[in-house]
Amino acid sequence: MSLRKLTEGDLDEISSFLHNTISDFILKRVSAKEIVDIDITVLVEYTDELKVDISAELYLDELSDADPGIVDEAVDAAYRSLESFLDGFRE
């Protein structure tokens, strides 16, 4: 099943889904008190196919013992969950 023609609103919805998935993943595993900042950038483009680029940075308090590698796990989880989310956009 292929994706239907995606609108700008669809792309915004996909981008928000990915952003929220990453943020939720991190916040479930790291106390908000340990986080100085989270920078998540999601670029979603659609011409003939869907292109998704995600970058994320996690800035932790210097006293935090959380593994900064959690951000990579969060991005991987977002990519994995994207496929089932896209089912709502298929023809």
Curated annotation (Swiss-Prot):
Superkingdom as given in the UniProt entry:
Archaea
Q: Which cysteines are joined by disulfide bonds?
A: none
Q: Which family does it belong to?
A: Belongs to the UPF0440 family.
A Pfam family of the record is: DUF3194
Name this polypeptide is given: Uncharacterized protein MTH_677
Q: Which InterPro entries match?
A: DUF3194, MTH677-like_sf
